């Protein structure tokens, strides 16, 4: 009887550990500290609350989602563990903010992209480096990497100190049109559809603005999804970086005639 009780207690402990482990992330793991040197963290200035992720694309510019915009934003570069006191040299402010079509009138299928010019350039280091813009459009079927400090539980919100990373699949745009009829997505759009149709892996609240990296290239910006996160047959939507390349590159080059593209 004693042996049976011991075995029963061990089984209970194993089941308890398995349940806790499955709740640690929405299908991902903690990112390696050397894996995300281009990932930036956006905070609301007055409340000091974490808002979104973003991507450093050169020493002076960051790409994120338009819906992450606030009147007063702090941007931190070279961050891994958010519980560690930030160095003042990691902190930047927006000098200029640009929105596609010059207006913050994004939708679930268009214009959810914001280009931020930092108040001063960053110095590259082991943990601070840019992610290159794509040289070609992404290929459906690609395995893509997502990362961020977004919630690791859904629908409850639990924000981790260290960013989490996961692999998802780039899907045909029609998959998202079928999966999200409530969004009334148009036949064509400047967005990407990505996720795991079996469920269990997904970006979620406050991962917004972070990168979707396919075959080593910065192809998407975390934009919209359904809640709770990581449901089967509910992939998420990502702003397509490649379709905004001309706009991005011309603004960075200082052209004033392309700030409001049609």
UniProtKB/Swiss-Prot annotation:
The active site is at 67 (charge relay system), 112 (charge relay system), 208 (charge relay system). Keywords: Blood coagulation cascade activating toxin, Disulfide bond, Glycoprotein, Hemostasis impairing toxin, Hydrolase, Ion channel impairing toxin, Potassium channel impairing toxin, Protease, Secreted, Serine protease, Signal, Toxin, Voltage-gated potassium channel impairing toxin. One of its GO terms (biological process) is proteolysis. The keyword Hydrolase applies. Belongs to the peptidase S1 family. Snake venom subfamily. Negative results: does not have phospholipase activity, does not aggregate platelet, and does not affect the release of the neurotransmitters dopamine and acetylcholine in the nervous system. This is Thrombin-like enzyme gyroxin B1.3. It comes from Crotalus durissus terrificus. The lineage of its organism: Eukaryota, Metazoa, Chordata, Craniata, Vertebrata.
């Amino acid at each position: 009887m004693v042996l049976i009780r011991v075995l029963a207690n061990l089984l209970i402990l194993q089941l308890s550990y398995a349940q806790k482990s499955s709740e640690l992330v929405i299908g991902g793991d903690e990112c390696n500290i050397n894996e995300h040197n281009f990932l930036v963290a956006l905070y609301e200035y007055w409340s000091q609350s974490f808002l979104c992720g973003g991507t450093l694309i050169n020493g002076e510019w960051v790409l994120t989602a338009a819906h992450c915009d606030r009147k007063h934003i702090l941007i931190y570069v070279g961050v891994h563990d958010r519980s560690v006191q930030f160095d003042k040299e990691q902190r930047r402010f927006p000098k200029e903010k640009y929105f596609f079509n010059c207006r913050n009138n994004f939708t679930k299928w268009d214009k959810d992209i914001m280009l931020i010019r930092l108040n001063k350039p960053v110095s590259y280091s082991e943990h601070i480096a840019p992610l290159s813009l794509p040289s070609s459009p992404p290929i459906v079927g690609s395995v893509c990497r997502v990362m961020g400090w977004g919630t690791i539980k859904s629908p409850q919100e639990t924000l981790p100190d260290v960013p989490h990373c996961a692999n998802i699949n780039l899907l045909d745009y029609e998959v998202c049109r079928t999966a999200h009829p409530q969004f009334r997505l148009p036949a064509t759009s400047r967005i990407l559809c990505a996720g795991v149709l079996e469920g269990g892996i997904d970006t979620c609240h406050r991962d917004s603005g972070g990168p979707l990296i396919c075959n080593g290239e910065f192809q998407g910006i975390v934009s919209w999804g359904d809640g709770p996160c990581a449901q089967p047959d509910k992939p998420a939507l990502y702003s397509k970086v490649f379709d905004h390349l001309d706009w991005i590159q011309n603004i960075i080059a200082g052209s004033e005639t392309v700030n409001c593209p049609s």
